[in-house]
A protein has these predicted regions:
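Glycine-rich adenosine-cofactor-binding loop
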Residues: 2-25, 29-35
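Alpha-helical elements of the RecA-like P-loop NTPase motor core of helicases
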Residues: 14, 39, 101
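Glycine-rich phosphate-binding loop and adjoining beta1-alpha1-beta2 segment
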Residues: 25-68
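Conserved beta-strand scaffold positions in the cores of enzyme catalytic domains, especially
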Residues: 30, 72-75, 116, 191-193
Length: 196
């Protein structure tokens, strides 16, 4: 089995877990300390019966309903680098820069202490950034305000008509990237940007 850690099971992570579970060849551990709220149902991959549960527990409930392989639930924040050890690939779907910075400190290219993937979506834009990225781009990639943000973007008014779906697009692209990376890690992009 291929051992994957996914940090964050919101807009991107909830779809990524589903895609990778369907494939059935991954051992997945998910970290997220958030609880599922009703407002999340509009753009995150959850079922209404799980509102109020931790997102990692709600992920398994949905996987169970669909007869898919369950994940290892870790309803905690990722706070220290030690938590990143022991995985073939660590994937950040979290909505804050502190976790991303910790991941990027693991290094780049052949010198990376661990292999990582950073997935982001905001409004009509999304990005996949891997440990293969040119280190000279890092300052730009890690620029921004502290704290968390919605993958829907700051101008989303909460209405279904205004929902953006880039979190689903980047989760799908990442699933394909992960499949290719485990087969031939030399033949994958260092980064991808999607905008509609």
């Amino acid at each position: 089995m291929r051992n994957i850690m996914i940090i964050g099971t919101g807009g991107i992570g909830s779809y990524l877990v589903d895609f990778l579970s369907r494939i059935g060849i991954y051992d997945i551990t998910v970290f997220d300390d958030d609880k599922l709220e009703e407002k999340n149902l509009t753009y995150q991959n959850y079922i209404p019966d799980t509102v109020g549960q931790t997102k990692v527990s709600a992920v398994n409930e949905r996987l169970k309903v669909n007869g898919l392989k369950l994940v290892d639930e870790q309803p905690y924040l990722v706070l220290v680098e030690k938590q990143l050890k022991g995985y073939d690939l660590v994937i950040c779907c979290a909505d804050n820069l502190a976790v991303r910075r910790m991941l990027y400190r693991q290094g780049y290219g052949d010198d990376a202490k661990l292999k990582w993937l950073d997935l982001r979506a905001q409004g009509r834009n999304a990005a996949l950034i891997s440990y293969k990225v040119n280190e000279n781009l890092v300052d730009d990639l890690l620029a921004g305000s502290e704290g968390s943000f919605s993958c829907q973007g700051g101008d989303w008014d909460g209405s279904p008509e205004q929902v953006n779906c880039m979190q689903i697009a980047v989760a799908g692209v990442a699933s394909q990237w992960i499949q290719r990376w485990f087969i031939d890690n030399e033949n994958v992009a260092d980064k991808m940007v999607l905008n509609v």
